[in-house]
UniProtKB/Swiss-Prot annotation:
EC code(s) of this entry: 2.8.1.-
Name of this chain's protein: tRNA-cytidine(32) 2-sulfurtransferase
UniProt KW Oxidoreductase keyword: no
Subcellular location: Cytoplasm
Chain positions of motif PP-loop motif: 95-100
Cofactor(s) it depends on: Mg(2+); [4Fe-4S] cluster
Organism: Psychrobacter sp. (strain PRwf-1)
Subunit structure, interactors included: Homodimer.
Length: 368
Protein backbone atom coordinates (compact mmCIF):
# COMPACT_ATOMS: atom_id res chain seq x y z
CA UNK A 1 0.00 0.00 0.00
CA UNK A 2 2.34 2.74 -1.29
CA UNK A 3 1.64 6.39 -1.91
CA UNK A 4 3.73 8.85 -3.89
CA UNK A 5 4.18 12.32 -2.44
CA UNK A 6 5.51 15.62 -3.67
CA UNK A 7 6.31 18.14 -0.94
CA UNK A 8 5.42 17.78 2.76
CA UNK A 9 2.18 19.43 3.79
CA UNK A 10 0.58 20.18 7.12
CA UNK A 11 -2.75 18.95 8.42
CA UNK A 12 -4.92 22.07 8.55
CA UNK A 13 -8.36 21.76 10.19
CA UNK A 14 -9.57 24.75 8.20
CA UNK A 15 -9.13 22.73 5.01
CA UNK A 16 -10.98 19.82 6.58
CA UNK A 17 -14.11 21.68 7.63
CA UNK A 18 -14.40 24.24 4.85
CA UNK A 19 -17.59 23.89 2.83
CA UNK A 20 -18.57 20.69 4.63
CA UNK A 21 -22.02 22.02 5.46
CA UNK A 22 -24.16 24.72 3.94
CA UNK A 23 -24.44 27.86 6.08
CA UNK A 24 -28.19 27.99 5.66
CA UNK A 25 -28.46 24.54 7.22
CA UNK A 26 -26.43 25.82 10.19
CA UNK A 27 -28.79 28.76 10.67
CA UNK A 28 -31.82 26.48 10.57
CA UNK A 29 -30.39 24.10 13.14
CA UNK A 30 -29.34 26.91 15.47
CA UNK A 31 -32.91 28.17 15.51
CA UNK A 32 -34.35 24.83 16.62
CA UNK A 33 -35.84 24.60 20.07
CA UNK A 34 -33.28 23.15 22.48
CA UNK A 35 -35.86 20.72 23.88
CA UNK A 36 -35.75 18.87 20.56
CA UNK A 37 -31.98 18.40 20.63
CA UNK A 38 -32.16 14.79 21.80
CA UNK A 39 -35.07 13.75 19.64
CA UNK A 40 -35.11 9.96 19.39
CA UNK A 41 -34.45 8.92 15.82
CA UNK A 42 -36.61 5.84 16.11
CA UNK A 43 -39.86 7.50 17.17
CA UNK A 44 -42.82 6.23 15.19
CA UNK A 45 -44.90 9.39 14.87
CA UNK A 46 -48.15 9.88 12.99
CA UNK A 47 -47.15 12.68 10.65
CA UNK A 48 -48.62 14.13 7.51
CA UNK A 49 -46.55 14.05 4.33
CA UNK A 50 -45.58 17.68 4.83
CA UNK A 51 -44.68 17.08 8.47
CA UNK A 52 -42.67 13.99 7.54
CA UNK A 53 -40.66 15.95 4.99
CA UNK A 54 -40.05 18.76 7.50
CA UNK A 55 -39.10 16.25 10.20
CA UNK A 56 -36.57 14.56 7.92
CA UNK A 57 -35.18 17.96 6.97
CA UNK A 58 -34.65 18.89 10.60
CA UNK A 59 -32.94 15.56 11.34
CA UNK A 60 -30.75 15.95 8.27
CA UNK A 61 -29.70 19.47 9.22
CA UNK A 62 -29.06 18.44 12.82
CA UNK A 63 -26.94 15.51 11.67
CA UNK A 64 -24.87 17.71 9.36
CA UNK A 65 -24.18 20.09 12.21
CA UNK A 66 -23.10 17.21 14.46
CA UNK A 67 -21.02 15.71 11.66
CA UNK A 68 -19.25 19.01 11.10
CA UNK A 69 -18.54 19.33 14.82
CA UNK A 70 -17.00 15.85 15.09
CA UNK A 71 -14.94 16.22 11.93
CA UNK A 72 -13.57 19.50 13.23
CA UNK A 73 -12.74 18.05 16.65
CA UNK A 74 -10.96 15.06 15.12
CA UNK A 75 -8.98 17.20 12.67
CA UNK A 76 -7.92 19.52 15.51
CA UNK A 77 -6.76 16.57 17.62
CA UNK A 78 -4.78 15.22 14.67
CA UNK A 79 -3.13 18.60 14.17
CA UNK A 80 -2.47 19.35 17.85
CA UNK A 81 -0.68 16.05 18.47
CA UNK A 82 0.70 15.46 14.97
CA UNK A 83 -1.16 12.15 14.89
CA UNK A 84 -1.16 11.57 11.14
CA UNK A 85 1.68 12.51 8.80
CA UNK A 86 2.22 12.45 5.09
CA UNK A 87 2.59 8.85 3.90
CA UNK A 88 1.15 7.19 7.01
CA UNK A 89 -0.74 3.92 6.87
CA UNK A 90 -3.33 4.19 9.64
CA UNK A 91 -4.65 0.90 11.01
CA UNK A 92 -8.05 1.55 12.59
CA UNK A 93 -8.96 -1.05 15.20
CA UNK A 94 -12.65 -1.77 14.68
CA UNK A 95 -14.51 -3.68 17.38
CA UNK A 96 -18.05 -3.21 16.11
CA UNK A 97 -18.87 -0.63 18.78
CA UNK A 98 -20.09 2.92 18.26
CA UNK A 99 -16.69 4.49 18.96
CA UNK A 100 -14.61 2.57 16.43
CA UNK A 101 -17.31 2.86 13.75
CA UNK A 102 -17.39 6.63 14.24
CA UNK A 103 -13.61 6.87 14.18
CA UNK A 104 -13.35 4.87 10.97
CA UNK A 105 -16.10 6.87 9.29
CA UNK A 106 -14.50 10.23 10.08
CA UNK A 107 -10.96 9.17 9.17
CA UNK A 108 -12.15 7.90 5.80
CA UNK A 109 -13.73 11.30 5.16
CA UNK A 110 -10.57 13.15 6.20
CA UNK A 111 -8.48 10.88 3.98
CA UNK A 112 -10.47 12.05 0.95
CA UNK A 113 -10.06 15.78 1.56
CA UNK A 114 -6.92 16.20 3.68
CA UNK A 115 -4.00 18.15 2.18
CA UNK A 116 -1.72 15.21 3.04
CA UNK A 117 -1.71 11.66 1.71
CA UNK A 118 -2.38 8.79 4.06
CA UNK A 119 -4.07 5.40 3.84
CA UNK A 120 -6.67 3.85 6.12
CA UNK A 121 -7.16 0.14 6.72
CA UNK A 122 -9.67 -1.39 9.14
CA UNK A 123 -8.68 -4.35 11.30
CA UNK A 124 -10.93 -6.44 13.51
CA UNK A 125 -9.87 -9.21 15.88
CA UNK A 126 -12.47 -11.96 16.20
CA UNK A 127 -11.66 -13.36 19.64
CA UNK A 128 -14.20 -16.19 19.31
CA UNK A 129 -16.53 -15.01 22.01
CA UNK A 130 -19.68 -17.13 22.24
CA UNK A 131 -22.49 -15.68 20.17
CA UNK A 132 -20.25 -13.25 18.31
CA UNK A 133 -21.93 -12.36 14.97
CA UNK A 134 -18.96 -13.05 12.72
CA UNK A 135 -20.64 -11.83 9.55
CA UNK A 136 -21.64 -8.33 10.72
CA UNK A 137 -18.34 -6.48 10.42
CA UNK A 138 -17.06 -8.16 7.24
CA UNK A 139 -20.39 -7.50 5.53
CA UNK A 140 -20.41 -3.84 6.57
CA UNK A 141 -16.80 -3.21 5.57
CA UNK A 142 -17.28 -5.01 2.26
CA UNK A 143 -20.46 -3.07 1.45
CA UNK A 144 -18.73 0.21 2.23
CA UNK A 145 -15.72 -0.70 0.10
CA UNK A 146 -13.34 -0.32 3.05
CA UNK A 147 -10.05 -2.26 2.84
CA UNK A 148 -9.89 -4.49 5.90
CA UNK A 149 -8.54 -7.54 7.65
CA UNK A 150 -10.49 -9.84 9.96
CA UNK A 151 -8.13 -11.65 12.33
CA UNK A 152 -9.40 -14.82 13.99
CA UNK A 153 -7.80 -15.83 17.28
CA UNK A 154 -9.40 -17.70 20.17
CA UNK A 155 -8.22 -15.49 23.01
CA UNK A 156 -11.57 -15.96 24.75
CA UNK A 157 -10.68 -19.52 25.80
CA UNK A 158 -7.31 -18.33 27.10
CA UNK A 159 -8.89 -15.55 29.15
CA UNK A 160 -11.55 -17.86 30.54
CA UNK A 161 -8.91 -20.34 31.67
CA UNK A 162 -6.74 -17.82 33.52
CA UNK A 163 -9.26 -15.37 35.02
CA UNK A 164 -10.89 -16.56 38.28
CA UNK A 165 -14.62 -17.13 38.11
CA UNK A 166 -16.62 -14.07 39.07
CA UNK A 167 -13.88 -11.65 37.96
CA UNK A 168 -14.21 -9.43 34.90
CA UNK A 169 -12.50 -10.62 31.72
CA UNK A 170 -12.07 -7.13 30.28
CA UNK A 171 -8.52 -6.37 31.41
CA UNK A 172 -6.99 -9.71 30.36
CA UNK A 173 -8.99 -9.73 27.14
CA UNK A 174 -7.77 -6.23 26.32
CA UNK A 175 -4.12 -7.12 26.91
CA UNK A 176 -4.30 -10.15 24.63
CA UNK A 177 -6.10 -8.15 21.96
CA UNK A 178 -3.56 -5.35 22.18
CA UNK A 179 -0.63 -7.71 21.72
CA UNK A 180 -2.18 -9.33 18.66
CA UNK A 181 -3.01 -6.00 17.02
CA UNK A 182 0.41 -4.50 17.76
CA UNK A 183 2.14 -7.40 16.08
CA UNK A 184 -0.16 -7.31 13.05
CA UNK A 185 0.38 -3.57 12.58
CA UNK A 186 4.10 -4.18 12.23
CA UNK A 187 3.48 -7.15 9.93
CA UNK A 188 1.45 -5.14 7.39
CA UNK A 189 3.57 -2.00 7.68
CA UNK A 190 0.98 0.20 9.40
CA UNK A 191 2.71 3.27 10.82
CA UNK A 192 -0.09 4.36 13.17
CA UNK A 193 -2.65 2.38 15.18
CA UNK A 194 -5.87 4.35 15.66
CA UNK A 195 -8.01 3.53 18.70
CA UNK A 196 -11.56 4.69 19.38
CA UNK A 197 -11.13 6.10 22.89
CA UNK A 198 -12.94 9.42 23.31
CA UNK A 199 -12.65 12.31 25.76
CA UNK A 200 -14.84 10.66 28.39
CA UNK A 201 -12.73 7.48 28.27
CA UNK A 202 -9.66 9.62 28.92
CA UNK A 203 -11.31 11.37 31.86
CA UNK A 204 -12.58 8.10 33.35
CA UNK A 205 -9.08 6.61 33.18
CA UNK A 206 -7.67 9.73 34.82
CA UNK A 207 -10.02 9.41 37.80
CA UNK A 208 -9.59 5.64 37.95
CA UNK A 209 -5.84 6.14 38.41
CA UNK A 210 -6.38 9.08 40.77
CA UNK A 211 -8.84 7.29 43.07
CA UNK A 212 -7.52 3.74 42.92
CA UNK A 213 -4.01 3.82 41.44
CA UNK A 214 -2.33 6.67 43.29
CA UNK A 215 -1.11 8.28 40.07
CA UNK A 216 -1.90 11.23 37.83
CA UNK A 217 -2.17 9.62 34.42
CA UNK A 218 -4.78 8.86 31.81
CA UNK A 219 -4.83 7.88 28.12
CA UNK A 220 -2.58 10.13 26.04
CA UNK A 221 -3.87 11.19 22.61
CA UNK A 222 -0.63 9.85 21.12
CA UNK A 223 1.63 7.17 22.56
CA UNK A 224 4.76 5.27 21.61
CA UNK A 225 4.41 1.65 22.72
CA UNK A 226 6.79 0.37 25.39
CA UNK A 227 8.74 -1.68 22.86
CA UNK A 228 9.02 1.38 20.56
CA UNK A 229 7.52 -0.64 17.69
CA UNK A 230 4.15 1.12 17.33
CA UNK A 231 2.62 4.58 17.63
CA UNK A 232 -0.94 4.68 18.99
CA UNK A 233 -3.25 7.57 18.25
CA UNK A 234 -6.66 8.50 19.65
CA UNK A 235 -8.22 10.93 17.15
CA UNK A 236 -11.48 11.05 19.14
CA UNK A 237 -9.66 12.58 22.14
CA UNK A 238 -11.66 15.82 21.90
CA UNK A 239 -15.03 14.16 21.19
CA UNK A 240 -17.70 13.64 23.86
CA UNK A 241 -19.33 10.23 24.16
CA UNK A 242 -22.86 11.65 23.98
CA UNK A 243 -22.05 13.09 20.54
CA UNK A 244 -20.72 9.72 19.38
CA UNK A 245 -23.95 8.06 20.52
CA UNK A 246 -25.99 10.52 18.46
CA UNK A 247 -23.69 10.14 15.47
CA UNK A 248 -23.88 6.35 15.54
CA UNK A 249 -27.68 6.51 15.68
CA UNK A 250 -27.83 8.81 12.70
CA UNK A 251 -25.46 6.61 10.70
CA UNK A 252 -27.22 3.41 11.80
CA UNK A 253 -23.99 1.49 12.28
CA UNK A 254 -24.49 -2.28 12.84
CA UNK A 255 -23.42 -2.23 16.49
CA UNK A 256 -22.07 -5.42 18.05
CA UNK A 257 -22.56 -5.63 21.84
CA UNK A 258 -19.37 -5.69 23.88
CA UNK A 259 -20.52 -8.04 26.65
CA UNK A 260 -21.15 -11.21 24.66
CA UNK A 261 -18.87 -13.10 27.02
CA UNK A 262 -21.15 -12.25 29.93
CA UNK A 263 -18.43 -10.27 31.71
CA UNK A 264 -19.49 -7.03 33.35
CA UNK A 265 -17.74 -3.70 33.18
CA UNK A 266 -15.16 -3.12 35.90
CA UNK A 267 -17.17 -1.89 38.90
CA UNK A 268 -14.75 0.92 39.73
CA UNK A 269 -14.80 2.23 36.15
CA UNK A 270 -18.58 1.92 36.03
CA UNK A 271 -18.90 4.04 39.18
CA UNK A 272 -16.57 6.67 37.76
CA UNK A 273 -18.51 6.76 34.49
CA UNK A 274 -21.71 7.33 36.48
CA UNK A 275 -20.00 10.11 38.41
CA UNK A 276 -18.89 11.82 35.20
CA UNK A 277 -22.39 11.60 33.73
CA UNK A 278 -23.87 13.15 36.87
CA UNK A 279 -21.31 15.95 36.77
CA UNK A 280 -22.03 16.61 33.12
CA UNK A 281 -25.78 16.80 33.79
CA UNK A 282 -25.41 19.15 36.76
CA UNK A 283 -22.42 21.19 35.56
CA UNK A 284 -22.14 21.06 31.74
CA UNK A 285 -18.70 22.72 31.57
CA UNK A 286 -17.02 20.74 34.35
CA UNK A 287 -15.71 17.88 32.20
CA UNK A 288 -14.40 20.30 29.60
CA UNK A 289 -12.57 22.18 32.34
CA UNK A 290 -11.03 18.98 33.74
CA UNK A 291 -9.86 17.93 30.28
CA UNK A 292 -8.38 21.39 29.73
CA UNK A 293 -6.52 21.03 33.04
CA UNK A 294 -4.92 17.85 31.72
CA UNK A 295 -3.45 19.99 28.93
CA UNK A 296 -2.23 22.68 31.31
CA UNK A 297 -0.02 20.91 33.85
CA UNK A 298 2.25 22.90 36.19
CA UNK A 299 4.85 20.44 37.58
CA UNK A 300 6.19 23.00 40.08
CA UNK A 301 2.74 23.15 41.70
CA UNK A 302 2.52 19.39 42.27
CA UNK A 303 4.74 17.08 44.33
CA UNK A 304 6.45 14.78 41.82
CA UNK A 305 10.20 15.04 42.38
CA UNK A 306 10.85 13.35 39.04
CA UNK A 307 8.99 16.06 37.13
CA UNK A 308 10.37 19.04 39.02
CA UNK A 309 13.74 19.57 40.73
CA UNK A 310 12.60 20.79 44.14
CA UNK A 311 16.00 20.04 45.74
CA UNK A 312 17.80 22.61 43.61
CA UNK A 313 15.49 25.53 44.39
CA UNK A 314 17.59 28.48 45.64
CA UNK A 315 16.97 32.10 46.51
CA UNK A 316 17.70 34.66 43.81
CA UNK A 317 17.14 37.88 45.71
CA UNK A 318 18.45 41.23 44.53
CA UNK A 319 19.64 44.12 46.71
CA UNK A 320 16.44 46.15 46.40
CA UNK A 321 14.85 47.16 49.69
CA UNK A 322 11.32 46.03 50.48
CA UNK A 323 9.59 47.32 53.60
CA UNK A 324 6.41 46.02 55.18
CA UNK A 325 3.44 48.21 54.31
CA UNK A 326 1.10 48.55 57.27
CA UNK A 327 0.31 50.43 60.47
CA UNK A 328 2.59 48.81 63.02
CA UNK A 329 4.98 45.90 63.71
CA UNK A 330 4.96 44.41 67.19
CA UNK A 331 8.28 42.85 68.17
CA UNK A 332 8.47 40.13 70.81
CA UNK A 333 11.49 38.59 72.57
CA UNK A 334 13.71 41.14 70.85
CA UNK A 335 16.87 39.83 72.47
CA UNK A 336 16.45 36.46 70.76
CA UNK A 337 15.88 38.18 67.42
CA UNK A 338 19.04 40.22 67.93
CA UNK A 339 21.08 37.13 68.75
CA UNK A 340 20.23 35.50 65.43
CA UNK A 341 20.85 38.72 63.53
CA UNK A 342 17.27 39.72 62.78
CA UNK A 343 16.11 43.35 63.11
CA UNK A 344 14.45 44.37 66.36
CA UNK A 345 12.89 47.47 64.79
CA UNK A 346 11.97 46.60 61.16
CA UNK A 347 11.24 49.53 58.88
CA UNK A 348 7.61 50.10 58.05
CA UNK A 349 5.96 51.92 55.17
CA UNK A 350 2.57 53.62 55.63
CA UNK A 351 -0.22 51.45 54.28
CA UNK A 352 -1.85 54.49 52.67
CA UNK A 353 0.83 54.53 49.99
CA UNK A 354 -0.25 51.09 48.84
CA UNK A 355 -3.92 51.99 48.71
CA UNK A 356 -3.43 55.31 46.97
CA UNK A 357 -3.21 53.57 43.60
CA UNK A 358 -6.61 51.95 44.24
CA UNK A 359 -5.35 48.48 43.35
CA UNK A 360 -4.44 45.36 45.30
CA UNK A 361 -0.72 44.44 45.15
CA UNK A 362 -0.24 41.33 43.01
CA UNK A 363 3.19 40.19 44.19
CA UNK A 364 3.02 36.47 45.02
CA UNK A 365 6.49 35.03 45.61
CA UNK A 366 5.09 31.49 45.98
CA UNK A 367 3.51 31.34 42.51
CA UNK A 368 5.82 33.75 40.71
Amino acid sequence: MQTNFSQPQTFNPADITRNVIDNNQDDMVDSLDSDEEDLDLDLDLELSDEQEIAHKGVKSARFKKLQKKLRKQVSHAIRDFNMIEDGDVVMVCVSGGKDSYTLLDILLFLKRIAPINFDVVAVNLDQKQPGYPEEVLPNYLQQQGIPHYILEKDTYSVVKSVVPEGKTYCSACSRLRRGSLYGFAKQIGATKIALGHHRDDILATFFLNLFHGGSLKAMPPKLLSDDKQNVLIRPLAYVEEKDIIKYARYKEFPIIPCNLCGSQENLQRAMINDMLRQWDDAHPQRLASIFKAMQNVAPSQLADRELFDFESLTLQRDDSKRDFEGHNIQVGVANELAEIGLPTQPDIKPFESATAAKKIPTINPIID
